Amino acid sequence: MSNERTAQQSDIKQLISKGLEQGYLTYAEVNDHLPEDLVDPDQIEDIIGMINGMGIEVHEVAPDAETLLLNEGNTGNREVDDTAAEEAAAALSALDTEAGRTTDPVRMYMREMGTVELLTREGEIAIAKRIEEGLSEVQAALGAFPLSTELLLSEYELHKEGKRRLTEVVVGFNDLIEEDNSVTSSVDVTDESIVEVDEEDDDSVGNDEDAPMIGPDPAEVASRIESLSTEYAKFKKLYAKHGPEHKAVIKVREDVAAIFVTFKLSLPLTDLLVQQLQNMVNSVKDHERKVLHLATNVAKMPRKDFIRSWENNQTNLEWVEDAIKRKQKWSSALRDIKDQITAEQQASIDLEKVNSLTLADIKEINRMMVYGEAKASKAKKEMVEANLRLVISIAKKYTNRGLQFLDLIQEGNIGLMKAVCKFEHRRGFKFSTYATWWIRQAITRSIADQARTIRIPVHMIETINKLNRISRQMLQQFGREATPEELAKEMDMPEDKIRKVMKIAKEPISMETPIGDDEDSHLGDFIEDPNVESPVDTTTNVNLSETVREVLAGLTPREAKVLRMRFGIDMNTDHTLEEVGKQFDVTRERIRQIEAKALRKLRHPSRSEQLRSFLDID
């Protein structure tokens, strides 16, 4: 393999040297020097692009002498640099090898994952701090947005009314986070003990998300909420009196934001606040887009003129009049849509009043939030990519449990992303130690939810795993399978529940399971279908129909037709005496007489003997 690659690099080096010397290459020359197994057009285009990037033009046919003379300034003075040619050849050879290696998604994923370097403890802390910084910037932006404070206060009121848990609103305080040196010093011992527990508790299905959180001190939360509410009321009062740009209003708004950022909010509430700000910014931009459309598309105002004059005039209701007074060729058209533009500006003014901010402040706050989110997302991405190998190592332990390996990796990656979001480096643990629990939880829960054809609830999966573990222990202890009574006593559960769990734990069997050595028959062939008529009944009914037709053929046509209509033989339904009478244009009584006469004939031994065998005689 190494010799092949060396020869390949040598060929490509000669090709590049030739191209640098003569200033061009043909597609035929490039194709002759590429590996035979390289057939992907996109990969070939990439290679030709790299050759073009070296200043070597690739032509269908060799250019004539005049063309070369015209391009002499670009091509004739090149010097063949062996080192450059070798480097380029190595790069192209690597590209070829990469292209022809494999298209297996698992191998491609592993190869790409292996290019990311592992993090040191210091690297983990650095990334965790960047995540914190990004999230802090997001919360600072939310704190500067008055409606965020209003929503936080309303959510706390719902908590006081018993409609929210405290941890659904506030989970802690950002200004009370301290370094715990004692925890940091015991990292190694704690990590080892956690890994040991991890190995022992392999069948458990964790549910840390549903576990009750300890949460912050309710009295401290109430005190801070009271301070926030007081400052916010003061802000609203000053805003109503002086407007958004007064120094006193800005000062109080900053005080409100300073208290707001001390709260460590729950993730759902943070997402709600972010969505609220984004919706408000979208509303502002929507009104601006409508004005832009009216001015540039309807009134045909030049876009540059609009942008130049519109800046800082979004809420200036005199802007349209000022633009019309410029007496441009689009002024009359602008006058026709003046009311529409003014209506959009008035809507923007209303948004300012609702938000207690200027439009410029709203946009700046949104810019701060987007920047913080991008910063945190980038750091989270780095942390996730650096720990993908941890997911692989854990997922390997859960193969052959009902999910494919790639599915296990995907579920483990979801757990890894949750771990990144919840990781607190100040507690002193290594990230891999903390993430292991989240990855295991995600994988085991996915196996419980998806591995079985018939889904079993997670709590029942836990019971089944416990039952299997105790059954194995008792099998080793007694040398035989444990009875339901013994399992019930060991697990401290009723015997009927043990039997129910054992019944649920059974795996479904495919109806296509072959039976016997020849495998011509399947399990489904031996299962009775109560909805299908048995072959015996089918044969009996067919014979009965044929016999009845033969017997009726011995009657007169009129008698046979009356019986057929009265009993629905070979018809969709039976008929009443009156319906049959109308058919024959006789009275009901006459039809009854014909029917009675025909039945007497059928009771004659010569005819009844043929039908008597079909009667069910007990």
UniProtKB/Swiss-Prot annotation:
Annotated keywords: Cytoplasm, DNA-binding, Sigma factor, Transcription, Transcription regulation
Gene Ontology molecular function: DNA binding; sigma factor activity
Annotated region described as Sigma-70 factor domain-4, given as residue ranges: 551-604
Subcellular location: Cytoplasm
One cellular-component annotation, GO: cytoplasm
Sigma-70 factor domain-2 as annotated region, ranges: 383-453
Keyword hit for Ubl conjugation: no
Region ranges (Sigma-70 factor domain-3): 462-538
CDD domains linked to this entry: Sigma70_r4
Superkingdom per UniProt: Bacteria
UniProt record, GO biological process: DNA-templated transcription initiation
DNA-binding region, residues: 577-596
Keyword Endoplasmic reticulum attributed: no
Region entry Disordered, spans: 197-216
Pfam family membership, one: Sigma70_ner
Gene3D superfamilies: RNA Polymerase Primary Sigma Factor, Sigma-70 factor, region 1.1, Winged helix-like DNA-binding domain superfamily/Winged helix DNA-binding domain
Entry similarity comment: Belongs to the sigma-70 factor family. RpoD/SigA subfamily.
Function summary: Sigma factors are initiation factors that promote the attachment of RNA polymerase to specific initiation sites and are then released. This sigma factor is the primary sigma factor during exponential growth.
Record's subunit section: Interacts transiently with the RNA polymerase catalytic core.
Protein name, per record: RNA polymerase sigma factor RpoD
UniProt organism field: Xylella fastidiosa (strain Temecula1 / ATCC 700964)
